[in-house]
Amino acid sequence: MTTELPFRLFDCDNHYYEATDAFTRHLEPAYRKRAMQWATVDGKTRLLVGGKVNKFIPNPTFDPVAAPGVMDEYFRGRNPKSADPGKLFGELEPIRPEYRDRDARLAVMDAQGMEGCIMLPTLGVGMEQALASDLPALAAAFRAFNRWLDEDWGFAYRNRIFAAPYITLCDPGNAARELEWALDRDARFVVMVPGPVTTPTGLRSPADEAFDPFWRLANDAGITVCYHGGETAYARYLGDWGESDFTEAFRASPFRSMASYDPMQDTLASLLARGLFHRFANLRIASIEVGSSWAFHLFEKLAKAYGQVSHLFPEDPRETFRRHVWVSPFYEDDLASLLTLAGEDHIVMGSDYPHVEGLTEPASYLKDLQNFDYTARQCQAVMRDNGLFLATRRPA
């Protein structure tokens, strides 16, 4: 049953399934054996990254693939038979045209009542750490990826599909050049994963002044920088507890589901503590597909830190956060408390369509908001107005 909305929605978390040549079509020849390759291993098509089989996605060809939203209940914390996550996919189906074709996707968006969306990677958010030991290859891989993305999806197609080029900060000069290139092609968003940045001299905060050329461009152009969940540098810490130190999608682990490490919380803490938003007062940050529980923990720590060392902050960092950060909560989160913390103008919906953990029907997000007594005006702000605001450049 289709959920009827009194407005056309803007979804801040839509995904494509990458073409098999997304990383290779435009890859510079010097990096063909150092970045992404396809190989047949034991009769199966496998993705090699840096010469090693990569298992971030069980089937990175995405054909066949599970239907949208089949694990909705699991991610709401409901799995009464304790079925293995891999068994919840149901019958796989051939890849649908709209997962890879922008015009087919527009037709689906029309049927969904969707005005526009941020279009984000599936495989791409798991690749940065896989190449962290070869930073030139990492930078080259995402240069190639972004050119594929521009070619197949565009960065502002019909002013409705806003595909976000992926920026790795591992090489500050390359990051600034990539952003300049994307801005010339009307990019409204860029995407990266949270956590410290791997550089030739070690891990560094993304707010380190070495990355100011990138942040200055983002600030001056008035785009939105999205932090999206994915494979981060934090995965290595799980190894310290005897867990796998790399992510395999949908492989269950009790400890992984409870561990308190939080790259999104720490990333925002670092951006605030190191004064990024006061160096660049026009920055807009959106957190996507990392939920919102981290924001509550962060606010507790910000309040205490400001109470202890207020002289080290230009202002209460919670107020800085509220000006510069937009949060896309999981639909199963405490949406009422988030409204108090962030305000209705800084919450954006994200359906995660067509992923298995997302919503089968993006418009049904409305029901989750209504369950927390959001007013009609607040629902429209979260499901339309705020996303459109972020998709509009706001030059400094």
What does each of the following model-derived ranges do?
Residues T2-F10, A19-G116, R147-F155, R177-E180, ...:
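Mid-to-C-terminal alpha-helical segments outside catalytic/metal-binding sites
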Residues F10-Y17, C226-G230:
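Histidine-centered catalytic micro-motifs
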Residues H15, T122, G195, E231, ...:
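Flexible loop residues that form catalytic
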Residues Y17-T20, R25, C117-M119, V125-L131, ...:
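Short catalytic/ligand-binding loop motif for oxyanion handling, primarily in non-cytosolic enzymes
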Residues G86-P97, A107-A132, R160-T168, R188-M192:
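Divalent metal-dependent hydrolysis catalytic cores, especially in the metallo-beta-lactamase
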Residues K87, E91, L131-L135, P200, ...:
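A short, mixed-charge helix-start or loop-turn motif at secondary-structure junctions
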Residues A111-G113, G124-W153, P172-W181, T201, ...:
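Active-site loop-helix segments enriched in His/Asp/Glu that coordinate
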Residues A140, N159-I161, I167, G173, ...:
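Catalytic pocket-lining loop regions of alpha/beta-barrel enzymes
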